[in-house]
């Protein structure tokens, strides 16, 4: 991480990406690693509450909701949230969030999907309780490297005792590309989550796409981990 340790993006930069349509991080289909490992995430449970950090307009939220689960996301960009509702043909209600000044809650009328529009670090279990599942795709790899411990502490605080947390990461040569998305190694994960969580590598795949050449890369590996609380 050393080559990227000082790289910092503020929320306005992310908002600008949404406003300018520079959302290459968005996938129009359900993530292949989620589909391949969803049974390990659900683990035979019904009506699981899932948390999506920095959810954007991930179609994975609707996919899990359609299975009978409920989803709570946090996203800073209101534009991203409204695009999600429009693209998924969801009617929603909008309300203020008492515990987070200035935040808004966008909740689908069927109650299956709730998205908080706010700074992730102002969110807490006091706002929305604990979760039995977390799908972290494009979140840990997007936050500033200097904030990883703060991020991990927040995510652990949201985990119920039986929570199953799928974490998607990217590995490449960080000397060649400054991010985001940032390089995250297994050692990085152990550093910030190892004290509280068991960490198991589920899958490692070649994630290189042609667009990555414009980043100056010629290889990229995508890895999926399962995190569970050490109390399990």
Swiss-Prot record:
GO terms for molecular function: thiopurine S-methyltransferase activity. It holds the Pfam family TPMT. Keywords: Cytoplasm, Methyltransferase, S-adenosyl-L-methionine, Transferase. It comes from the Eukaryota. Its main location: cytoplasm. The keyword Plastid does not apply. S-adenosyl-L-methionine binds at residues 14-25, 54, 75, 137. GO terms for cellular component: cytoplasm. GO terms for biological process: methylation. This is Probable thiopurine S-methyltransferase. Substrate binds at residue 25. It is found in: Cytoplasm. The keyword Cell membrane does not apply. Belongs to the class I-like SAM-binding methyltransferase superfamily. TPMT family. SUPFAM superfamilies: S-adenosyl-L-methionine-dependent methyltransferases (SSF53335). Its EC number is 2.1.1.67. It catalyses: S-adenosyl-L-methionine + a thiopurine = S-adenosyl-L-homocysteine + a thiopurine S-methylether.
